[in-house]
Regions:
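A conserved mid-domain beta-alpha-beta active-site/ligand-binding segment of alpha/beta enzyme cores
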Residues: 156-238
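A short alpha->loop->secondary-structure connector
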Residues: 42-45, 120-134
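Long, hydrophobic/aromatic-enriched structural stretches that serve as scaffold segments
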Residues: 76-127
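Gly/Ser/Thr-rich loops at beta-strand to alpha-helix junctions
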Residues: 27-33, 110-118, 142
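A structured, charge-rich N-terminal accessory region that forms the first stable segment of a protein
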Residues: 4-81
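Short amphipathic alpha-helical interaction segments
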Residues: 260-269
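Short, conserved secondary-structure transition motifs
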Residues: 136-160
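Short acidic, hydrophobic short linear motifs in intrinsically disordered regions
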Residues: 241-255, 264
Length: 269
């Protein structure tokens, strides 16, 4: 694929290397790391994947915040406390190291997992006096891709298409909105987050729908259940006594019931 894509770019008169070696690609997971290499990208790759859509996101100083996040990750995933903390320290440290003179591209999609991480990154960069050159690809759909869920499902050639057609500079308005959203996310009272959703987020159009879905994970006043819990129980109730594995419940949830999928299988378990 790498040679074929390179040949096609040569024939089209496009540069073989879309970016440059001094560029840094930031993504909330590793799902496009290999595809970027196949597509010919030469820049460094930074993963920043603390899943804010789950667990406590308290308004604390960095050390205490990472303590809380590490404890949650250990409770929900098969990791030791040291491994969880070391990984978070490495990811946060890699982002903190980006500053003036760096060229950074943020790769994100439309679900609450991505958008909450995007908000945190924008909030972080908004506070810097010496800020890197920031660009972003943030999409909720891709022409010709039916059932688009995320960037990780895309062929390297489609990532190149996004690079050439969807790459845009990050604006001051987007940085300010990211800071506003992150401040609301870390507030134990969801009132401000709900206001942001109701007012809309024109600077980041995909943010408001993702935040709306995130708020629906809060316990319902009527049932005490978050939406994922309620949908999962609904799937079981419709099984007519048939035994369903967690895998089948997750598949049904993601393909037939969840309007804005954001959970991976490990996150669901």
């Amino acid at each position: 694929d790498t040679l074929r894509i390179a040949r096609q770019r040569m024939e089209a008169g496009r540069p073989l290397v879309p970016d440059s070696a001094d560029m840094v690609h930031v993504r909330c997971g590793e799902d496009i790391r290999h595809s970027l290499k196949v597509a010919g990208f030469a820049g460094a790759f930074v993963e920043f994947s603390d899943p804010y859509c789950q667990g406590p996101v308290p308004r604390l100083d960095r050390a205490a915040f990472l303590d809380k996040r590490s404890e949650f990750i250990v409770s929900g995933y098969d990791r030791s406390l040291k491994d969880a903390r070391d990984r978070l320290e490495a990811e946060y440290g890699a982002v903190d190291a980006l500053g003036e003179g760096d060229r950074v591209v943020l790769w994100f999609e439309h679900d609450s997992y991505d958008q909450l991480i995007l908000a945190r990154l924008l909030a972080h960069f908004s506070r810097l006096d010496e800020r890197p050159d920031l660009q972003m690809i943030c999409v909720g759909e891709v022409p010709g891709v039916q059932g688009f869920v995320g960037l990780g499902q895309l062929h390297p050639e489609v990532l190149l298409w996004l690079w050439e057609n969807e790459l845009k500079p990050v604006t001051e308005g987007q940085l300010a909105l990211g800071a506003e959203v992150w401040n609301a996310v870390t507030d134990p009272d969801p009132t401000e987050l709900d206001r942001i959703v109701r007012d809309g987020t024109p600077a980041l159009p995909l943010m408001a729908p993702a935040l709306r879905r995130h708020l629906r994970e809060l316990p319902s006043a009527r049932t005490g259940l978050g939406l994922t819990q309620a949908l999962s129980l609904s799937i079981l109730a419709r099984a007519d006594g048939q035994k369903l594995t967690a895998g089948r419940i997750f598949q049904a949830l993601m393909t037939r019931h969840e309007l804005l999928p954001f959970l991976g299988d490990l996150m669901f378990w």
